From Swiss-Prot:
Gene that produces this protein: psaD
Principal localisation: plastid
Family: Belongs to the PsaD family.
SUPFAM superfamilies, A to Z: Photosystem I subunit PsaD (SSF64234)
CC annotations in GO: chloroplast thylakoid membrane; photosystem I reaction center
InterPro entries (UniProt xref): PsaD, PsaD_sf
Record keywords, A-Z: Chloroplast, Membrane, Photosynthesis, Photosystem I, Plastid, Thylakoid
Function description: PsaD can form complexes with ferredoxin and ferredoxin-oxidoreductase in photosystem I (PS I) reaction center.
Organismal lineage: Eukaryota, Rhodophyta, Bangiophyceae, Bangiales, Bangiaceae
UniProt-recorded name of the protein: Photosystem I reaction center subunit II
Subcellular location: Plastid, Chloroplast thylakoid membrane
Length: 141
């Protein structure tokens, strides 16, 4: 799936309500999640209730990014769907691509991604805290 969003993509069938959350999102911002379903199957909505995903491309609007991330976790774990993408949609129609930002999910290794706070040894090779207690070193140095 490309990093652009097709707003004419079909939505999953959902007979419930979002509890008014999307009404407020129309004046602020809303989030869209897209994915490709392998077959028609029911899934749990982050707002409560169930919906039926369509076979092929799906587009679902939610009020919060966390709801999209929760649905993405469910799609990845339960349905083995890993091509979901999350977008922010502003009221003026502008769309911003959010997740995964560099095309690789955060828990996966990416050759171009710089490691932050990583140590080049296993946890068993950490210094004993008592050996650095009264020195100027910290246990994480």
């Amino acid at each position: 799936m490309p990093d652009t969003i097709n707003l004419n993509m079909p939505s999953p069938t959902f007979g419930g309500s979002t509890g008014g959350w999307l009404r407020a999102a129309e004046v602020e911002e809303k989030y869209a999640i897209t994915w490709t379903g392998k077959n028609e199957s029911k899934f749990e909505m982050p707002t409560g209730g169930t919906a039926t995903m369509r076979d092929g491309e799906n587009l679902l609007y939610l009020a919060k990014k966390e709801q999209c991330l929760a649905l993405g976790t469910q799609l990845k774990g339960k349905f083995k769907i890993s091509d979901y993408k999350i977008y922010r949609v502003f009221p003026n129609g502008e769309v911003q691509y959010l997740h995964p930002k560099d095309g690789v999910f955060p828990e996966k290794v990416n050759a171009g991604r710089a490691s932050i706070n990583s140590v080049d040894h296993s946890i068993g090779k950490n210094v004993n805290p008592i050996n650095v207690k009264f020195t100027n070193k910290a246990t994480y140095d």
